[in-house]
Amino acid sequence: MVSTSFRAAASFIVISAFAAAGVDAATESGRFAIEGAGLATCAAFTQAREQRSPDDKNAAAVDSYARFIGWVEGYLTGVNRYLGDTFDIAPWQSAELYGVIIGEHCEKNPNERLFEVVQKMVITLTNDRLKQPSDMVTLKLKDNKGENRGVTIYTEVVRHAQDELKKQGLYRGEVNGQWDEDTQKGVAFYQAAVGLQDTGLPDPLTLWLLFSPQKTQLDAAAAAAKAKNKK
């Protein structure tokens, strides 16, 4: 399940991102057929997301939600294939984050179709897409509770994170895409500053906040802190 702080922090970003993304209706020259789950309504997506559970008793809901997320990932793969100057449209985002982004929008727009929402999401992702192939590195750390955590990430995303951390005075090393102790500490400092668990791992929510406009970061940090205090 997605944590309350994850959900609260992401919601501020989702609202502002979709507000700026407005997608026009298809024109005669731009019409295309929508396959499968893309025609489902936001209401159906929200229902499947709310009912999903690892419990076998809710296997149907799990399958339904997985079908929606699978459609989203397939759509994004198509974007990677056909959008010019693009290798990966979503280089650090995860299925969990897709669910939060789409879910927050769908709760407020129940009659929209899934494909419309995903089109809008793609527009918000375009500026931060990975344009060229990049090596990947798997990072494994123990969090403050001694639990093992890991993430696989592009070295180009590490470089981008180092650059943003340096701009905020949280990292003084080289911006070279190489993961090291200083980079880990910089990520942890940033996470603590915005109210996230300071694992030091560049997880999707951390990167989403880090790469977002400063005002959005502050709003999201306030939401995360508020949610954290309610636990």
Show where each model-derived region lies.
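Bacterial N-terminal signal peptides that target proteins for export
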Residues: 1-10
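Terminal, positively biased "leader/anchor" segments
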Residues: 2, 20-21
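Bacterial N-terminal signal peptides
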Residues: 9-19
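Cell-envelope/ECM-targeting effectors and their regulatory/trafficking segments
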Residues: 22-231
